[in-house]
Amino acid sequence: MCMCMTRREFLQAASIVAGGLALTGALPRAAAGAQPLVSVPKVLDGTQAILAPLITRHARLLDDPWVLMHGVRAMGPDFTVNSERAVDLLCSRFLKTQRVAGKDYLYMPVEHEGHPNACLKTLLEVGVPLSHPFTLDGRRYTVGDLANSAKALFVFDPKTADRDNLAWTLIAFSLQTVPSRDTWTNAWGQQIRFTDVVRFGLDTLDETTRQFRQAKAQGVMPTEKDTIMGLTCGGTHLAYALASCVANGHGGDQARARLRDYLDLHIWRLQADGYLMDRFYRQAAPPKDADPALQRLAAIYYHDARLKFYGHSFEIISYARGHGLLTPTPAQTGTIEQGARTLHESVKAIEGTDFFEFRKTNPRLFHHLVGDSCHAYHGIRMTPGVNQA
């Protein structure tokens, strides 16, 4: 998902108005007393209180594995639908098999998970053990089978790799690969060295942020979007994924230093991206005498864009702080606190919104609202033993 919509997307969405249905569900009990990995600015206490019911209401969909995955990402492996764990629904209903060289491998179709290995990384991140069993088409498997299949099916060539599909695989492999034994042979006989994949990810961060780095060095706000903003959710997934790699020992001291350099830039982006978003939505705003429905839709897109970037950013910041990868300076702490206020404002603005209003007529916006709410909740309340391994 992109951080902002284009003018064409806005105009196409502007004519969409629809009714919806309601689902209910309680917050998983395990989330009530557990302590987050790190503390976040106090204003976000109220933010998570708004997000939790939005997630439990809108993410319990039996026919939408992408939404289910995000519910698990926010609430952890105990997230249920009709008393059945979403983790088991995802594995038993939506996984498929692919045959390569006479052997079957498990995978989640990309039309279900959005990006390769998004389902696997979600299961591993929330602490589902590799031994966890499930049944698919009458056959017994484990999450470990899915993890081994992902490695077997992974193909890597830095000359042709889609750098916008890398983040989810980086997370999954960082959690199941021992740094000292990070080389394997895939199903087609290609040797994969995970260190090379991590380096490619770090190179991507560097190459897509050149303009931002220049503006930061000059002490000015950017005049245009940088390339990283064209990556999914403004490149935040890639940054988080590389933090997972470094935290789990991949890439050594050089990777840690390169990541730390980017984290400094990302805190600067809390101001820079906000500046660019505000400018974009001011220019795209409908006239004051426009149809109220159009004005409301424009406002929802604006608030979701901020929810997306700042929610994903707090995932990065919370994870990096919790794993000793980031110790903000006093000035950076002030920037983070301002980002927290912006995130709270965006969430407060969508409080009470019925996301189902958009599910049939504007499914992209529906997915934005649900997914971004889930990532923001996880960033605010990243809790070991609940929604974080």
Please provide the spans of the model-predicted regions.
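Preference for long, amphipathic alpha-helical scaffolds in soluble/luminal domains
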Residues: A30-A389
